[in-house]
Design a protein with these regions (language model features):
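Immediate flanking context of iron-sulfur cluster ligation sites
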Residues: 4-14
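N-terminal pre-ligand scaffold of iron-sulfur
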Residues: 13, 25-27, 46-47
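Conserved active-site region of classical short-chain dehydrogenase/reductase
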Residues: 15-18, 117
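Conserved long hydrophobic alpha-helices within structured protein cores
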Residues: 17-21, 124
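Core segments of cupin and vicinal oxygen chelate
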Residues: 20-31
């Protein structure tokens, strides 16, 4: 099986401009609204920005966590939410190790990045890119990106708890 590509944002490069979130909400909902974006940028003060996206985990815990079986994988390997089945329990949100699923402020249902790539095209810092786990490991040979995520994991989680 071919290794699945996913959208990823490098916090070492991200400027926190939120062009990715604004692009996403405009593309899908025709409004600039970070709370409606399928991705997000979390700021850890004073100025460290973490762009967060779904990684379509091979063994996706969000799929198993949903009591309604509302999350599934497409034939291309993308994890999606079936809005007809989702009732907004939020178990998938809690299960996601990348804080990439949240409850939509209008529908009350889970939503997430579906890897359309609109944000990749528009990131002015080139901090967002399509990658694979193998390529990402190669890009982070020195471990500095992983170290940032590990160092700020609790802060990212706390920020997520406060997000809509």
């Amino acid at each position: 099986m071919t290794e699945l590509k996913f959208v990823f944002g490098d916090p070492r490069i991200c400027s926190g401009c939120t062009t990715c979130s604004n692009t996403c909400s405009m593309f899908y909902y025709k409004v600039i609204s970070p709370s409606r974006a399928r991705n997000r940028v979390l700021r850890i003060e004073p100025a460290l920005d973490f762009p967060l996206f779904c990684r379509n985990c091979e063994d996706a815990p969000c799929i198993d966590a949903c009591p309604e079986q509302a999350l599934m994988r497409t034939s291309k390997g993308i994890v999606i939410v079936n809005n007809k089945k989702c009732v907004g329990h939020g178990e998938c949100v809690k299960a996601c190790p990348y804080y990439a699923i949240r409850i939509h402020p209008d529908t009350g249902k889970a939503f997430k990045c579906i890897q359309c790539g609109e944000c990749v095209e528009r990131c002015p810092a080139d901090a967002i890119f399509m990658t694979t786990e193998k390529d990402l490991a190669e890009r982070d040979k020195d471990g500095s990106m992983r170290a940032l995520y590990e160092q700020h994991r609790d802060e990212i989680y706390d920020k997520e708890e406060d997000s809509p």
